[in-house]
Amino acid sequence: YVSGFSNGGYGCLHIALKYPEKYGTVGAFSAGDKADSEFLNDGSEKSLRRIQLYGDGDLHKTEYGITYQADKLIEQESIKPRIYHACGELDPWIDMNHILRDYFMSHIEYDYVYDEIEQIGHEWKFWREELKRFLVFTGLINN
């Protein structure tokens, strides 16, 4: 099992799709696909850090793209992690979460659950509640 919030949620999706035999279930909270973020190399420190981590250019067709990794598992007919994904309605990155939601909802090969809570944003109160729901999803605790 692996789970994370925000950037950590993206990282958990990335690692679970890269190593599904090790991470059979993933919880991703407020976690969009970073490959869906438009990148403008403006010379800022943030841009330079991104280039050091991922390289310069489009990440969609690289190992850093969540949907790219998910497509590879389908093509290879590999095992796939179960995915619990949640985001607050007021989260500033809700659009990136919707892109992932739409992708996984349209690919029945994945055991995927999405939860979106009204009137809550990118915050710990939401993540604490969703972590409990994720643990129920895993079967580690009862409802």
Tell me the role of every PLM-derived stretch.
Residues 1-143:
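Non-catalytic cap/lid and distal C-terminal segments of serine-dependent acyl enzymes
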